[in-house]
């Protein structure tokens, strides 16, 4: 069996199958809703590209790491390596912005949301997911309390 990866960089290895399947579900749900010009923030291993990109007129991805060589072979997909925020795109550029299991790792999360709003076309949509930090199935125990510095796990007013 392969090594157990964290949800930080999901792989298709058998030992990581639950996390992979759970993460892939977001891409399938988004694929039913998106169209036009799409930006993905936090492409990671890129497993969602083959699900979502065929539904987009243009598909641009941004990740802090360079894409794996096999990902760059996808036609009609443009890769950008950058730390966000900011987003290096013109205002009103995208019909949809998607970002799955990423925002909890962005220190300037409020600024990122402002940037997403800026690059979305009028009427555009931001589809975002973040893990439930009390999820006992999360493969990295520290992440259950480390997401958003543990504040997400605390009840309001605690």
Positions of the model-derived regions?
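Conserved N-terminal segment of class I S-adenosyl-L-methionine
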Residues: 1-90, 96-100, 110-113, 146
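A SAM-dependent methyltransferase catalytic signature shared across enzymes that methylate proteins
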Residues: 156-158
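Conserved class I S-adenosyl-L-methionine
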Residues: 127-152
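Di-metal (Zn2+ and/or Mg2+/Mn2+) metal-binding site signature of metallo-dependent hydrolases
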Residues: 105-109
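Active-site micro-motifs of SAM-dependent methyltransferase domains
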Residues: 86, 104, 135
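A short glycine-rich, Lys/Arg-flanked "PGG" loop and its adjoining helix->strand segment in the class I
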Residues: 110-125
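Transmembrane helix irregularities
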Residues: 102, 120, 148-149
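Residues lining the SAM
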Residues: 100-103, 129
